[in-house]
Amino acid sequence: MGEIKDLAEVHNLVSDIFHYPKTAEEWEKYKLSDDQVSHFHEYGYVSGIKLLEEDQIEVLRKELAEIRDPNHPGHHLFYEFHSNESEDSNSVLFHSLGHWRISKAFHDVLWNPAFVMAAHQLLEYKPVRFWHDQLFSKPAKHGGVVAWHQDYSYWTRTVAMQHLTCWTGLDDASTENGCLHYIPKSHLWGLLDAPSLAGDMNGLMAYLTEEQKAEFKPVPIELKKGYGTFHHPLMVHGSYENKSEISRRAFVLNVFADGTVSNTDDELLKGVPPIPKGKQMQGKFFPLLYKNK
């Protein structure tokens, strides 16, 4: 396959998988409705957003299969790579960060116009800057859990809290194969302690008040492949095992509003040069994805 270029060097589309709009009129078709934006702010999430076409899904699936190989020549560019992060010896949960640096298609989903426009709206029309990506793959029959958690509990090394997460399926996601579940309005609970992400599904319960436990009513987010769901950084969410006959492959894009700053002098992602505490998140690894048109 030859030497792999670090695609973090390029802050625009590198393939023809997406068409980037050139006019305000072209952007219009990607906008969320007012009702969708209101749902996000009231409940902490908005789901059922079409982000990918069938041919784009196929390209991403193909590139996912390639980069999952630990012998891939771009393997050293991952921030994290866990062929199995599950703490259950009978389950498998593939999880990685940093594949946008390796795969053209996973690089270009950062600039998917349907994604960046929705993110811009949900971040209250602020410019959108990239934080990091994730891949989660649960194989058929023995896919592991992702425990209940809030994303920002792992991200306090960046401030202010003006982050956003988008989860997109490369397979149909159902309760049978381990789809995402949300606790509606839990984004109003404040910041909770961070449990082990691939450990006990209910580890977070130890940190909840009796009132929060009473409100803990999971809602499954079943989605067709190519559709996404956006959630607030304090949204409590997780996903159960995959006991079905089909895999559950998905990627996650995490972003924040431009102007977010580092809250540590340590490295923010493995192998990424530190950004001094108080300095703005920007540069090679944190590209600006969308600003006001």
What are these regions (language model features)?
Residues 2-26, 70, 88, 192-197, ...:
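Non-heme Fe(II)/2-oxoglutarate
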Residues 2-43, 49-148, 154-155, 195, ...:
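Non-heme Fe(II)-dependent double-stranded beta-helix
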Residues 16, 173-236, 260, 278-279:
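Double-stranded beta-helix
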Residues 67-70, 125, 173, 189, ...:
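Phosphate/oxyanion-binding loops and surfaces in catalytic or ligand/nucleic-acid-binding neighborhoods
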Residues 134, 150-152, 168-172, 184:
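Short, structured patches in soluble enzyme cores that scaffold and shape functional sites
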Residues 141-142, 147-150, 158-159, 176-182, ...:
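A short secondary-structure junction signal
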Residues 151-156, 216-218:
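Short, P/G- and charge-enriched loop/turn segments at secondary-structure junctions
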Residues 156-175, 222-223, 230, 254-258:
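Short, conserved beta-strand element in jelly-roll/cupin
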